[in-house]
């Protein structure tokens, strides 16, 4: 056990975690030259295309140190995006140490800080690594100083490497083995194994990634899931090297995979503890704190026949992604679907894309909203995650919106722009600290403003240098109203939005104009209105297509022309009474772009 090292790689987006993982695998001979590919751990097509890591992946490597000892390295490559920070905290729970990778050109960014603090809270040994030293813009000394000033860990002898060229990678391995402590645990104690992650395999059923904290797990053992008490057989187990390799036994301190022929996707929840049926452990291992979704949106299958397939797909995905929340929902405009909760807009995009790709579904997404706390007139508190569930205005005492605490790190040159943006987003400044040329800003901004387009706007006002980390702070009373959209006098529940009363007329006006561009013209006029309660605040009309009925008249009497026009008018009127308006998918997402073009 003293030769096992469990560690994660944590960093901000694009600081080179996945590339460093590739080099470690290559140096330790996990894959042959032929099998090596760039970002070998980003196994999902989606991850490759976007160049981001979405799922944490684990690998077991054997490292022969210069002193002749052979060490077993179990490491987990983690995502860097703020939407996937729960993946990082789960990975860290299985480790004794973490490599904090910092780009020697960019320096410390907000996610570097957030992930590093998560690791420190869990008492992990943090080893700083300065990556990308081959870049012309790299300034390792300045960045090492930044790590000390901002993060507060000693970085004087931080390992310097370039994952792309492979320079300094052996030093990283040496430092790992030296600084990260071996796992603690008792091989003779009753088995306690923590489930770090699970996913669904069409042939094997549920595959779980486990970290053995105490005891040992052998093939064929009867195991018990501690939260549900269900018993299963350990049919197959092994490690990833990144290929799946079968083993007979997983020893204390190791990380490996396990298949127990679990068909029910909720049979072994992530964060649960496994133990042996014949010699159970007394207590459960501390799991993970449940993450609360920040953004809610309705997902509906385009054809109602896909509803069952959609439900199964969501079940399988939620097994792999513990933070996905979903419940059935029905909409008068879109039929049956699910209300889903996500951690952020990127998470929502990724889930929708995975559903459409991996499960071959066609989906319509409604505009994302956040969750509101409503105090009704009879003094009960309800939580509302969809505008259509909001009680009528006369039944509401207080409407409280969620406020996020946003930590931003940015160069001083962009401070003015960023402060202007935060004020425009109804933000309140709570803190500002200067670290050399960097400024750390803390603002409290309503979650609805952060979730929609704050990140994109922050990047564009600071030319990509500012970075953001945010979390839910509290609910606060606010003057919010629901803006309904009526099409030909009928309310479309899927298009409603909740916004601040001061912004409602502008938002309504813009949204209506946007819809007018998106809805195709029909044989009759389509009236699009935005309303607060019964008060119409904006209107626009999609003009009808009409045939020129006078074309065959040439000259002729004016009463003849009037008769033809009158006849056409009556026909259009009849058509309007029975005509349905088909809304394109873009119409439901137009709400996201409201307020972007005008600035």
From Swiss-Prot:
Binding site for GTP: 14-19, 131-134
Any Pfam family: LepA_C
Subcellular localization(s) per the UniProt record: Cell inner membrane
GO biological process assignments: positive regulation of translation
Entry GO terms, CC: plasma membrane
InterPro entries associated with the record: EF-4, EFG_III/V, EFG_V-like, EFTu-like_2, G_TR_CS, LepA_C_sf, LepA_CTD, LepA_IV
Name the UniProt record assigns to this protein: Elongation factor 4
Organism ancestry: Bacteria, Pseudomonadati, Pseudomonadota, Gammaproteobacteria, Enterobacterales
């Amino acid at each position: 056990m003293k030769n096992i090292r469990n560690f994660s790689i944590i960093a901000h987006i694009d600081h080179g975690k996945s590339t460093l993982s590739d080099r470690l695998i290559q140096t330790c001979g996990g894959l042959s030259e032929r099998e090596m590919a760039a970002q070998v751990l980003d196994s999902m097509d989606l991850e490759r295309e976007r160049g981001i890591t979405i799922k944490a992946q684990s690998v077991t490597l054997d490292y022969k140190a210069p002193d002749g000892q052979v060490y077993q390295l179990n490491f987990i490559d983690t995502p860097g995006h703020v939407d996937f920070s729960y993946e990082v905290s789960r990975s860290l729970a299985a480790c004794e140490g973490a490599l904090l990778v910092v780009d020697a050109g960019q320096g410390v960014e907000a996610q570097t800080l957030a992930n590093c603090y998560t690791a420190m809270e869990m008492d992990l040994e943090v080893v700083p690594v300065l990556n990308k030293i081959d870049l012309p813009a790299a300034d390792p000394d300045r960045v090492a100083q930044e790590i000390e000033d901002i993060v507060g860990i000693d970085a004087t002898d931080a390992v310097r490497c370039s994952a792309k060229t492979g320079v300094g990678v052996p030093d990283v391995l040496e430092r790992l083995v030296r600084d990260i402590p071996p796992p603690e645990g008792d091989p003779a104690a009753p088995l306690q194994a923590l489930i770090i992650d699970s996913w669904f395999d069409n042939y094997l059923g549920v595959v779980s990634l486990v970290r053995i904290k105490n005891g040992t797990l052998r093939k064929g053992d009867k195991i018990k899931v501690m939260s549900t008490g269900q018993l299963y057989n350990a049919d197959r187990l092994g490690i990833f090297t990144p290929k799946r390799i079968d083993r007979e036994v997983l020893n204390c301190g190791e990380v490996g995979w396990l298949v127990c022929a679990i068909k029910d996707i909720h049979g072994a929840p992530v964060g649960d503890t496994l133990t042996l049926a014949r010699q159970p452990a007394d207590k459960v291992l501390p799991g993970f704190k449940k993450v609360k979704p920040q953004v809610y949106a309705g997902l509906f299958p385009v054809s109602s026949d896909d509803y069952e397939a959609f439900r199964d797909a969501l079940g399988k995905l939620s097994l792999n992604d513990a933070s996905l929340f979903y419940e059935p929902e029905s909409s008068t405009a879109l039929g049956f679907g699910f209300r889903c909760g996500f951690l952020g807009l990127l998470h929502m995009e990724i889930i929708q894309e995975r559903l459409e790709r991996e499960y071959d579904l066609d989906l319509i997404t409604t505009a994302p909203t956040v969750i509101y706390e409503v105090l009704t007139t009879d003094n009960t508190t309800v939580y509302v995650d969809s505008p259509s569930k909001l009680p009528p205005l006369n039944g509401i005492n207080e409407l409280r919106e969620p406020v996020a605490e946003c930590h931003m790190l940015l160069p001083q040159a962009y401070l003015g722009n960023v402060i202007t943006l935060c004020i425009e987003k109804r933000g309140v400044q709570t803190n500002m600290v200067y670290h050399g040329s960097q400024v750390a800003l803390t603002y409290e901004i309503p979650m609805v403003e952060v979730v929609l387009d704050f990140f994109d706007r922050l990047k564009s006002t600071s030319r990509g240098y500012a970075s953001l980390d945010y979390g839910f702070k509290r609910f606060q009373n606010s003057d919010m109203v629901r803006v309904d959209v009526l099409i030909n006098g009928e309310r479309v529940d899927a298009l409603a939005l909740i916004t601040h009363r001061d912004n409602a007329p502008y938002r309504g006006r813009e949204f209506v104009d946007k819809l007018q561009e998106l809805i195709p013209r029909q044989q009759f006029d389509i009236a699009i209105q935005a309303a607060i309660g019964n008060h119409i605040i904006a209107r626009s009309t999609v003009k009808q297509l009409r045939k020129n009925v006078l074309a065959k008249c040439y000259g002729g009497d004016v009463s003849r022309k009037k008769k033809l026009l009158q006849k056409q008018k009556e026909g259009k009127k009849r058509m309007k009474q029975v005509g349905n308006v088909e809304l394109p998918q873009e119409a439901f997402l137009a709400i996201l772009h409201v307020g972007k073009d005008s600035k």
